[in-house]
């Protein structure tokens, strides 16, 4: 695939604080188009906060975020940016079927009547098939296991046909089979030229899963190709010398 030019996301001087205490501080970050990127760091480092601030879900104290064509208006780009939140942050008791949830990814592309077209339903069914959830289409989302629910949220992201995807710990709480299915999908999205940003906690799998990584602990410690920045020196800076975390295959 031909390498894309430019950046999917550009962040400058981004700071977010809770009760006057900074959670992320003076973040500068450029994410090239077409990368599969991990955001890693210790608990409380600000990984989820960074994602939410970039998406406009949290209001920063300072800083700017620009997407794709240089626009800072996330609302104008809602059809081009997809988001898969942590499964634990979702109200799974919401009365909706698997197909209903997956179809939500098409809402931004529907007309003012908001009635799904046959093509939307077909695309949704294809996405559910791809994540192995087609046979559960009529089941209530609340009746699924955590791994199955995560697959449905991935199907929703696929139906959106976005250009940039943000995923907050999509592997958390899933079994090995689901994890393999998820990473296969993420790599497929990358091959299609999409940009995928993933909050991730398993350092062991970073070299195999991702080609770009951002190390964060309040600030950005390092960001770049895995082969260049994912090494012991940067990990020590990120995890404050936590030796047990540094025994990784790099």
Model segments located where?
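Conserved ABC ATPase "signature" region
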Residues: 103, 118-136
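Catalytic Walker B motif of ABC-type/P-loop ATPase nucleotide-binding domains
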Residues: 165-169
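H-loop (His-switch) and adjacent beta-strand-loop-beta switch element
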Residues: 212-226
């Amino acid at each position: 695939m031909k390498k894309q030019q430019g950046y999917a996301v550009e962040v400058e001087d981004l700071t977010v604080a809770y009760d006057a205490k900074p959670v992320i501080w003076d973040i500068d970050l450029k994410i090239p188009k077409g990368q599969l990127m991990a955001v890693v760091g210790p608990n409380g480092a600000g990984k989820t906060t960074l994602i939410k601030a970039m998406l406009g879900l949290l209001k920063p104290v300072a800083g700017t975020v620009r997407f794709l064509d240089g626009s800072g208006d996330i609302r104008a780009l809602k059809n081009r940016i997809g988001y898969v939140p942590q499964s634990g942050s979702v109200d799974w008791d919401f009365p909706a079927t698997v197909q209903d949830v997956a179809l939500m990814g098409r809402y931004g592309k529907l007309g003012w009547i908001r009635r799904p077209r046959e093509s939307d339903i077909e695309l949704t069914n294809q996405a559910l098939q791809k994540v192995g959830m087609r046979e559960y289409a009529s089941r209530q989302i609340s009746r699924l296991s955590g791994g199955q629910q995560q697959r449905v949220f991935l199907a929703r992201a696929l139906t959106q046909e976005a250009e940039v995807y943000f995923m907050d710990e999509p592997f958390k709480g899933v079994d090995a089979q689901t994890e393999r299915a998820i990473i296969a999908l993420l790599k497929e999205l990358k091959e299609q030229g999409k940009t995928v940003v993933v909050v991730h906690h398993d350092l062991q799998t970073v070299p195999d899963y991702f080609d770009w990584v951002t190390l964060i602990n309040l600030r950005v410690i390092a960001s770049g190709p895995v082969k260049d920045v994912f090494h012991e020196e940067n990990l020590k800076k990120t995890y404050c010398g936590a030796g047990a975390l540094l025994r990784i295959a790099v």
